[in-house]
Amino acid sequence: IAAGSLGGMSAMHEQTRGLNYIHHINQPHWFAAGGEEDREEFGVRIARELEAKRDELGEDKVAAFIAEPVQGAGGVIVPPDSYWPEIRRICEERDILLIMDEVICGFGRTGNWFGCETYDLKPDLMTFAKAVTNGYIPLGGVMVGNKVADVLLNHGGEFAHGLTYSGHPVACAAGLATLNILRDSKVIEHASSNIAPHFQARLAELRDHRIVGEVRGLGMFAAVELVRDKSSRERLAPDSQAAVFCRDTANDNGLMVRQTGDAMIMAPPLICNTAEIDILVDKLGEALDQTAAHYGVG
């Protein structure tokens, strides 16, 4: 219930009814909500909602702010450059703990080992999972910064964080093996320097497609937002039907993509080569052509 309440997926909130002590501010999704507003001004304005929410609730009611560096399942929402510096300022000035959810961004997805490094952030707590074992064995964890650890260890006794399967030797062995491969083979550095730039450049070519409203991405993941009209950002079809059609068409053509809302999401393996990236983008382009034809957009 707590995890569902923390996330931004409304279906989960409806299912669990949510927890009344968890509050949300708007996401820094400029394409969806920015209108004609300058992108960087939008980023600052949305970040300052944290400050306003803290004042609304009272300083003794706000323990922490938790977010992904880049929202993954929400649609690869890359925040404006102004967003995270303003969040960092607010957290530091208002003594709000910063918790980074690195489950998706962690271990190379944004071009660095962790997304917080990409945005020059030093979180007080950081969650991780997924790529720590390359997905072969379930493993997740929480990294605790000195600010929190010092209080727990020096003023509260033991750091009681054990769970039934904590430190499972098989899972931890898989994690260590994965980390060794990432480090010794320089997988992240190679992807960041050689593959990610090609991936983002090829996807950028789709911006001129007649049903593409926005192409956004960072490192080795990206999203393509579908629209009927580029100027008004009118959706191609209600209830994300067009995006579902595009996803299914891409799958039929041999390309696996994820659909979230009206966005097509891609997160190729870090070990891809440029030829495979070309296949990905070409197949997505074909799916976009078929989707445009299906909905009569010439």
Predicted regions span which residues?
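Conserved N-terminal phosphate-binding loop of PLP-dependent enzymes in the Aspartate aminotransferase
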Residues: 1-298
